[in-house]
Amino acid sequence: MIIYLHGFDSTSPGNHEKVLQLQFIDPDVRFINYSTLHPKHDMQHLLKEVHKAIEQSNDPEPIICGVGLGGYWSERIGFLCGIKQVIFNPNLHPENNMAGRIDRPEEYEDIATKCVEQFRMKNKGRCLVILSRDDEIHDNSKTAQALENYYEVVWDDKETHKFKKISQHLQKMKAFKENN
């Protein structure tokens, strides 16, 4: 099973395309929608829905993946639910760059302080990071610096922030999912 979390642009047709692409490596892809506007509510909702999806699945190695803001949530929710994560161009600091776009960006900072201390150290090796060299939203060299000591980082030379096409990374994702 692959759980897919959309980014800030939840209505983008690209989300459906990504789900279809993910079905090439696992027919059981679950799209979980969330508001993107209310971080604390989103965290509760995502924890509940991801936990429910894991319980309903008989997959011994489910993964969660997301793009942008969905990558932020995938890393945290996946860690808290004990499943591996694949994150594309994650938004590591929505508390800094979502001001004016969501109601309470400061809630992300609150979530970060309440999350398990040094969670990346405890999550080491359980997340695959795929970054675009041409991300027009975030400086992915900083993202790589923040994550490379904990996770494998793969660079993509073609895609932009929204990562419209993920098919070139599907076999890497499949191997990561199946490798204990």
Curated annotation (Swiss-Prot):
UniProt feature coiled coil, ranges: none
Pfam family, one: UPF0227
Membership in a protein family: Belongs to the UPF0227 family.
Protein name: UPF0227 protein VV1_2072
The organism of origin for this protein: Vibrio vulnificus (strain CMCP6)
